[in-house]
């Protein structure tokens, strides 16, 4: 049967394996406290759900691929309030069905093998969707390691200039999943300069931009030049709206125009009632502050027990994740399996890339009381 060989090369999505192991433990009657997947367990704010319901009409046709003008305006207004960046909602913003599908398909928009632009650069450990989308699009992929000694930032000086010249797009993700690291504006400025020198695009996945605990992170949109830069963001983590599938791409007018041409062939914007809910979400900050406070309380519970058990937390300045060094040099999957036997699910760092070995990721998605239960388990097991 003619199936893509990429399917075999990539293998099973690692978190599918984690789900299978979790089900086996639950079947034994063990209470499972799931810190494995980054799917917020908090309810979506009532006013957002009301906006969703109010947006449902008797007849709902296909949504416009470019999204409602009001949604593009709400996104542009949020970017200006949050980052001090003025965007043209007609030329520099396009809504998407969350961030995942847009990230996955982006390589199809930017690869140009006839010009030698056949390389996609990503980072690891990290969210695997950009890499997988690039491989399905036929690209070669270069993954830059994010190492603790470099502050979990890519070492751009280690890349051969010949590879930069082949790059169609360079992906970064800050605040970073899984390390929780944030990036200085200087990183984006350097990438934009390299992009101008070597003719590639910079794509910044900023899905965790609003989950921070000290200082609000900067955005790549704040770089002085956006001609070769686009940002992907989403309401999934910011507003606990993972199931709504609502996000956006913003930045380079030329790239946004290319997406306007491409996207009607592969999908559309979110349904109109989801867009109405999204307008409400992007227009409000109160529910986001409340979410940060909840995550902060859960974070404090785990930080306390991990510190008492001398488990070192690395990075973890933002996002909903704690990036924890595995004690005693134990392999990350073995350590995660040991915790799972006691009902605490964490993601082995090796699932997220070779440089993730030696760490595990705690996603702060269980309720605060469940975090306290997990802390008691960790107190006994570690």
Task: Report each predicted region and the residues it spans.
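A short helix->loop->beta-strand "cap" motif at the edges of active sites that frequently abuts
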Residues: 118, 197-201, 226-227
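Active-site phosphate-binding strand-loop segment of PLP-dependent enzymes
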Residues: 142-217
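PLP-dependent enzyme catalytic core of the Aspartate aminotransferase-like
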Residues: 142, 329-330, 334, 341-347, ...
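Conserved glycine-rich beta-strand-loop-beta hairpin in the small C-terminal domain of fold type I
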Residues: 279, 295-303, 313-325, 356
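Conserved core segment of the aminotransferase class I/II
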Residues: 222-296, 382
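N-terminal small-domain helix-loop-helix segment of the aminotransferase-like
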Residues: 2-98, 105, 281-283, 289, ...
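Conserved PLP-anchoring active-site segment centered on the Schiff-base-forming lysine
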Residues: 109-134
């Amino acid at each position: 049967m003619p199936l893509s060989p990429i399917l075999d090369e990539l293998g099973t999505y690692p978190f599918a394996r984690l789900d299978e192991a979790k089900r086996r433990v639950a079947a034994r009657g063990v209470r499972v406290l799931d810190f494995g997947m980054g799917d917020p367990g908090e309810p979506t704010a009532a006013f957002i759900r009301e906006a969703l319901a109010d947006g449902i009409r008797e007849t709902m046709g296909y949504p416009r691929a470019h999204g409602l003008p009001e949604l593009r305006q709400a996104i542009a207004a949020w970017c200006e309030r949050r980052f001090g960046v003025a965007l043209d909602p007609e030329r520099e913003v396009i809504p998407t069905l969350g961030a995942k599908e847009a990230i996955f398909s982006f390589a199809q928009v930017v690869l140009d093998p006839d010009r030698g632009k056949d390389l996609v650069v990503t980072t690891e450990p990290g969210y695997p969707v950009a890499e997988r989308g690039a491989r399905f699009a036929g690209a070669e992929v270069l993954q830059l390691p994010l190492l603790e000694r470099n502050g979990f930032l890519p070492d751009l000086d280690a890349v051969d200039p010949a590879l930069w010249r082949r790059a169609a797009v360079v992906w970064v993700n800050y605040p970073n999943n899984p390390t929780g690291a944030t990036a200085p504006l200087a990183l984006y400025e350097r990438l934009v300069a390299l992009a101008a020198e070597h003719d590639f695009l910079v794509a910044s996945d900023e899905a965790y931009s609003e989950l921070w605990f000290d200082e609000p992170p900067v955005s790549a949109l704040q770089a002085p030049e956006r001609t070769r830069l686009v940002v992907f963001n989403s309401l999934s983590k910011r507003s606990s709206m993972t199931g709504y599938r609502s996000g956006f791409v913003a930045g380079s007018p030329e790239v946004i125009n290319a997406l306007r041409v491409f996207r009607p062939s592969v999908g559309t914007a979110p349904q109109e009632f989801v867009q109405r809910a999204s307008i409400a979400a992007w227009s409000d900050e109160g529910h986001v502050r409340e979410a940060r406070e909840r995550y902060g309380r859960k974070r404090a519970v785990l930080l306390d027990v991990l510190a008492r058990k001398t488990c070192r937390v690395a990075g973890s300045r933002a996002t909903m994740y704690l990036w924890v060094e595995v004690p005693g040099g134990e392999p990350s999957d073995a350590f995660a399996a040991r915790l799972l036997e006691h009902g605490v699910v964490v993601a082995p760092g090796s699932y997220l890339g070779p440089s993730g070995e030696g760490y595990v990721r705690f996603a702060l998605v269980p309720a605060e009381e469940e975090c306290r239960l997990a802390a008691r388990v960790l107190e006994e097991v570690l």
